[in-house]
Amino acid sequence: MSESESDYFTDGSEDDFVPTSKKSTKKNASSKSKQPLGDATNSTVSSSRSSTPKPTNASETYQKLSQLEHILKRPDTYIGSVEKTKTEMWCFDAETESMVFKEVTIVPGLYKIFDEILVNAADNKIRDPSMKNIRVKIDAENNIIEVMNDGKGIPIEMHTKENMYIPELIFGNLLTSSNYDDDQKKVTGGRNGFGAKLCNIFSTQFEVETADLNMGKLYKQSWTNNMSNVSKPKITTLRTKKEYTKITFRPDLSKFDMDCLDNDLLSVLRRRVYDLCGTVKNCNIYLNDKRLNISSFKGYVEMYVKAIKERSPEPEPQDGTIKNFTTIVHEVFNDRWEVAFAVSDGSFNQVSFVNSIATTSGGTHVKYVSDQIINKLVETLSKKEKGKKKLMIKPQEVRDNMFLFINCLIENPAFTSQTKEQLTTKVSQFGGKDKFVANDNLINRILKTSIVDKIRAIANANEDKALQKADGSRKSRIKGQVNLVDANKAGTKDGHNCTLILTEGLSAMNLAVAGLSVVGRDYYGCFPLRGKLLNVREASADQISKNAEINSLKQIIGLQHKKVYTAENIKSLRYGHIMIMTDQDQDGSHIKGLIINFLETSFPGLLDIPGFLLEFITPIVKVTVKARGAGGKRVIPFYTMPEFEHWRDTEGKQCRWTQKYYKGLGTSTPMEAREYFTALDRHLKRFHALQGEDKDYIDLAFSKKKADERKEWLQGFLPGTHLDPEITEIPISDFINKEFILFSMSDNVRSIPSVLDGFKPGQRKVLYGCFKKKLRSEIKVAQLAGYVSENTGYHHGEQSLVQTIIGLAQNFVGSNNINVLKPNGSFGSRAAGGKDFSAARYIFTELSEITRKIFNPLDDPLYTYVQDDEQTVEPEWYLPVLPMILVNGAEGIGTGWSTNIPSYNPKDLVTNIRRLMNGEELQEMTPWYKGWGGDLEPMGPQKFKVSGRIEQIDSNTVEITEIPVKTWTNNVKEFLLSGFGNEKTQPWIKDMEEHHTTSIRFVVKLTDAEMQKSLRIGLLERFKLVSSLSLANMVAFDPMGRIKKYNDVLEIIKDFYYVRLEYYQKRKDYMTDNLQNQLLMLSEQARFIKMIIEKQLSVANKKKKQLVALLEEHNFTKFSKDGKPIKSSEELLTGDDADEEEETQEQEGDEDVGNTSVANIQEGEPEQAAHVPETIYSSYDYLLGMAIWSLTYERFMRIMQQRDQKEAELNALLSKSAKDLWNQDLDEFLAEFDKFLLRDEQERESLASNGKKKSTKRRAKATATKDQPNNKKVKVEPKEKKSTSAKPIVKKEASNEPQASSSSKPKEKDDILSFFSSSSSSAKKTTKPSGRATSNKEIETITLFSDDDDDEDIFNLNSSSSTKVKKEAKSRSATPAAEKSKKSKSSGKQSILDELEDLEILGNFDKPEPKERRTRETASTTKRNTKKKPVIIDSDDEDEDEEDDIVMSDGDDDDDFIVDE
């Protein structure tokens, strides 16, 4: 033995060693083979088979080995393979002093015994944190390895049970360990009691040296011959104050079939020493007396990253394409977890340590960390890169680009084997308070590395691969597309000349197919889209690849994913053009936009080809003009509403026409489709090739990442924006900004109210329907929903409309401050926030009395009404007398925008409006909710604290008497019930009682301790009776129709104020014009009558043209049908055109009278209103159409009197300003609002006093009463003027208030607008004789000249001869043809001249004798579909006789006249 060897070991004399056992000594003495352990054993077995006979009994077959024998016999179970193995692994290159990843040939078992000693040294740092050094010496030449640490030494004392020193017990006896107590949680590497003993067993010499400072002793002992021989321990006095433990061993190379420690093994052993630099904190590591310069785990990791960079075949780009390729993301999470991340070179790498053990095969700890990082990376990238869609990438593909470094401490770790290469401990058993969590900080730092580019590249490649599966090609035939009508030339060499028509559904496809009969099937194909195309910009590749519509389009057109198309290679497609054929509405625009988005995103270049994308337009309106003469009818199509409106206001005034709206393609007939395709150039429009900012606008419209920019884009939208219908080539940016934006706005329009009336369109439609129906008596909500849906063009389902109606009628606390509809039934309560309403078929509603005080009917003619198909529906907005958006508040969520506006006290609003009128500064207002008794406290400029009410009523009882507004009773109850506790929580409420009526009252009992706790916390806070109210999101459509965010409530008031004031001026101007027109008309009628009476004007025996010329000669003013003076005769039909129009009207009058039988009316075909032009004759209808009873002196005087009255009204109106009119409305509103509040308070007090809600009274049927006996006719005496009309049969409800009725209440105002107004040129008044059952029709009269009294006269006149009327009515109803024969010779239009001739009293006005008696009652039994109604001219003088009442004819037939015998 060399001198160097004597430094490590004893002299080897026989006195120094004793055999550990006889059996092992003999065994080892006889086996001196230099073969590897495995080979030696196998050769022994094989030789025994050849030379030794087989055992003859079972005892010889079955053997028992000692533990030591078993380890030597089967080493792979304990230390791994003892054969040389080629493997790729990280090593330390001593020459370059760097890590390298290379293929080496090592014996894993030899590496493992060295590792066991290193782990023991590292474990001692856990036991003794004061340890400072670990020194490793590897003498390859002499085959000697030494590991020393200066931590606490091994106790040098005798083991009481085993009767040997503890160092000998630990290193020389198997299955000895300090780690067997599983109740004690340790984070060391030792586990099974083998460890260093394995190193001893596989060494020819093994020595331990340890210093125990406590005992003051130094202990030395050695083993030889594979731990078979052990020397006696040498114990001496410790001469230093330093403790240490040193292990020196000589590996038994023969057991590993090795002659020496080769370079491959040495490089792995050196790397393992470097591992300690990263895993053992605050400890100096020495290798062969050289201190290693790595002092942290991050520094250790950098060695690997540097090696990765050197291995990379491509240099790191300098242009930023791949960011921070060699960046290390390192983070220490706690004292047990330290993780570093780097980007790998395409395969997953990990270097991990569990309690300083190198887990080269990973394990549960590596999976635990990597899974978290991968999931968070994919999730975050999905949000950042592609919106909310999931990236098409597998976790393993992400893992392949990761290099993870993990240094962790696991309590009592478990491994797959004694080699400890792979951890198997469950995550739940890792121990420690805090485990590793991939937090946002770590993920965000990882996202700054090049892994983002790698993941994106992999995901894109996967997506492309998936999408390419559905690629099309130029085939002559496509299989599996049942709905495809393929062009005959598609897929051939002429395919690029073919056009594919994409239609909106199958119904539109029928229209296209009908058109193909004109252009042929060779170059035109057709395919229907089912619904709306997928937004591919935000969709995942998985969604796109599974979308049937997109796959069909790719196959039909022949599109290939990501192929860049040009004008040259477009011939590779089956179709060279796409024509979009959708409805001309917002949904149609959306479909066009989605197709553009699909092509721009998936097939770059297609939109750069001029003429590739086309659209087919159809008319929105068709006008049928009745041409005169032999020309017949003429049809004029209009493709935009502005175009139609211009024609209507110009050329349309000169002719008779009807209009038909084409809402969708399905409205057109196959014949019309052929007409469209015949004039294909007129109906085709091209989309301009991409230019300028087109791509940016497409991205703006469809990308979720552009949400903020889209919000600003929508905010800049101006109502009335539309594409120019004259352009033949549509720029895509214009399409997005002027057509597609209408669809984008539609959701906001439905969800966000107007600042002017506070309504959304659905609410506005309901109110319009109620006004149109004159809803003064209750109706079922279900019926009202049906009526509104039918009459206002509502297209979203009646159930949604039902909820809107219920919302307008709800009046519980927190709902509406003013409910414009009455809640007659269960409309929901505060308990559930109104969601607990009854079914619509069980509840009733009607207009509240206050509603028309808010929405004055005098404003109705001033609104701009929406056109929906042939219907005129609700106005664009109403103008209430005060801003209802602040009265009832508003909530809604739209696209990119939402709103939340609180409610305010109407009286405060009125005060501020009047302050604005007076030029005073506005006062700040506090939100107010009717009936709510809580507290509101400011918490800043735009926030309020909302508090309920709670009081302590005894030592352990509290009473809740109010809850925060918008917090519902059931929510509070649920919270209180949770206070009773459950299996997981302790109770803190003893008992709870409810005593609610219309108010809130909870009585809650607590324990003494909980009461004290509640008082410390605060009763409001403990019982969650505090919320907040924000003013920071008050969004509404401003008066210009643009979305606007209001900064404060006063800004809303100002926006409302100026528009409302402007419309009061418009109301005054409108009323002034009407009064002036009425004055002029009355004056002209009086002059006409006077000239007839004084025989200055003769109308007898003159033709129409002569009469008109005569009137023009006397400068009589011409009036239109709506009562407005006609300034120029150029606006009228004259000459032959006028004669032909008059003849047409007379003929239609005859047809109408002859076709009034119910049997002749065709069901399902509503009469279409035709526009009838004004003629020179109709302009004098107000004179020549007067009934002959008007030509009396009494009537002349009455008209003069009425003229004076109207003049007085006009002067009174002119004396008032717009503000005066507004103040008058506000006074009336406040008076009604006080009544409204009083009724509400009385109802609540009544319900509270009864302790429960009263049952709803049943709606009484109209039954006979004392004043109105059943089944009896009521005869009204002619001279009595108790009412202006017969009492109608009405349903009555019990009420403390007198019921208003048209028959009993006097007019509150002069009906100024009832005279020839444009919106209602004549107002209908319906009167009905009393009695429950009557066969008489309702008598319809048209109010003119404030004729309340004369209506009564006419009714009395009819009533006085009711018997004759009924008989005549019955006969006319039974025999309409016979009655027609009794008509005068001019049944179409009766002039004064004709009437005088019929009555044979021409020139005699003193004693008129009618030719036959006709009554209004008789005339009403026969339906006449005429446009003009008879007009009653009467006087307001109550002392006039009814004989003076005269009915002015409309000139349509004789039935208009009412005379007395």
UniProtKB/Swiss-Prot annotation:
Co-factor requirement: Mg(2+); Mn(2+); Ca(2+)
Reaction equations catalysed: ATP-dependent breakage, passage and rejoining of double-stranded DNA
Name the record gives this protein: DNA topoisomerase 2
Residue ranges with Basic residues bias: 1251-1261
Region (Disordered): 1-61, 1122-1155, 1244-1461
Other observations noted: Eukaryotic topoisomerase I and II can relax both negative and positive supercoils, whereas prokaryotic enzymes relax only negative supercoils.
Record-annotated active site: 842 (o-(5'-phospho-dna)-tyrosine intermediate)
Main subcellular location of this protein, as a coarse class: nucleus
The enzyme's E.C. designation: 5.6.2.2
Positions bearing the site annotation: Transition state stabilizer: 841
Residues of the Topo IIA-type catalytic domain: 752-1226
Biased composition (Acidic residues): 1-17, 1133-1153, 1434-1461
GO biological process: chromatin remodeling at centromere; DNA strand elongation involved in DNA replication; DNA topological change; regulation of mitotic recombination; replication fork progression beyond termination site; resolution of meiotic recombination intermediates; rRNA transcription; sister chromatid segregation
Residues bound to Mg(2+) 1: 504, 583
Cellular compartment(s): Nucleus
Annotated organism of origin: Candida albicans (Yeast)
Positions that bind ATP: 120, 149, 177-179, 190-197, 418-420
Phosphoprotein is among the record's keywords: yes
Region (Interaction with DNA): 382-389, 1024-1033
Pfam families reported for this sequence: DNA_gyraseB, DNA_topoisoIV, HATPase_c, Toprim, TOPRIM_C
Cofactor annotation remark: Binds two Mg(2+) per subunit. The magnesium ions form salt bridges with both the protein and the DNA. Can also accept other divalent metal cations, such as Mn(2+) or Ca(2+).
Family: Belongs to the type II topoisomerase family.
Physiological role: Control of topological states of DNA by transient breakage and subsequent rejoining of DNA strands. Topoisomerase II makes double-strand breaks.
Residues in the signal sequence: none
Low complexity bias: start-end ranges: 41-52
Subunit structure and binding partners: Homodimer.
